[in-house]
C-alpha cells in the first residue's frame, strides 16, 4: 500500500554516531567504512534527507571524530553535528538541545544504511496520529532461549509469538522523549533503545512492521549483506 507524504509535519532526526565499533576490530569508527563509493553513515543520512518531513538532521559525534567534516554531506544545510556522549542516551540528549519548532524526532542508528524510503514513510504516516510514537520492528522468527549467565545452560524457552526485534528509526514527540530520557538518567537505568525509556515511564509506543533488510552493521560479515541490500535499494 502506497502511503502519502505529509509535508506539513516537521521532524528532526538524531543520528547517534559517537561509537567506535570495537566489534569490527578497526582503527576507525565503523560508520566510516566505505561500501562502493559512500560511507555507511552517508547512506544512512541520504535516506533521511530524502524525506520531505525531515527538516534537520543532528549527528552526535565522538569528541575525537575527525572524519565527519571530510564528508561532502556534512556541508548540507540541513545537517548539523554536536558532541555526543559516552553512552547512546547522552548522544541523543545532546541532539535534543538543538533549537527547533519541530514537534517530532526520529532516532536512527548511524550503522543502519539499508533503511528504505518506504519503511521510513510508513513509520511517519502510521505513527504521526499517535500521542506516544512508534518504532520499526520485525517479528522474532528464531526460537529464543533464556540461559544461566554463568555457565550458559538453558533455563527455559521464551514463547516468541509476541516478541519483536526492535529496529530504528524510532519516532516520538520531542518533549515526551526528552522527559523520558532525563528520567532514565536520573534513575540510573540502562537502556539500549529510546522506546525503552518511554516504556519505563509507562508509555506504550506503536510497533510498525519494518523490512528484514534494515540491518545494523555490527560484525564484519554484516558488510556482505549490506552491500547486497544497498545495491537493491539503489536500483529501485
UniProtKB/Swiss-Prot annotation:
Its EC number is 2.7.7.60. Catalyzes the formation of 4-diphosphocytidyl-2-C-methyl-D-erythritol from CTP and 2-C-methyl-D-erythritol 4-phosphate (MEP). Coiled coil: none annotated. Signal peptide: none annotated. The record marks 23, 30 as: Transition state stabilizer. This is 2-C-methyl-D-erythritol 4-phosphate cytidylyltransferase. The record marks 160, 216 as: Positions MEP for the nucleophilic attack. Belongs to the IspD/TarI cytidylyltransferase family. IspD subfamily. GO terms for biological process: isopentenyl diphosphate biosynthetic process, methylerythritol 4-phosphate pathway. The gene is ispD. SUPFAM superfamilies: Nucleotide-diphospho-sugar transferases. InterPro entries: IspD, IspD/TarI, IspD/TarI_cytidylyltransf_bact, ISPD_synthase_CS, Nucleotide-diphossugar_trans. CDD domains: CDP-ME_synthetase (cd02516). PANTHER family: 2-C-METHYL-D-ERYTHRITOL 4-PHOSPHATE CYTIDYLYLTRANSFERASE, CHLOROPLASTIC. It comes from the Bacteria. Transmembrane segments: none annotated. Gene3D superfamilies: Spore Coat Polysaccharide Biosynthesis Protein SpsA, Chain A. GO terms for molecular function: 2-C-methyl-D-erythritol 4-phosphate cytidylyltransferase activity. Pathway: Isoprenoid biosynthesis; isopentenyl diphosphate biosynthesis via DXP pathway; isopentenyl diphosphate from 1-deoxy-D-xylulose 5-phosphate: step 2/6. It is an enzyme of class 2 (transferase). Homodimer. It catalyses: 2-C-methyl-D-erythritol 4-phosphate + CTP + H(+) = 4-CDP-2-C-methyl-D-erythritol + diphosphate.
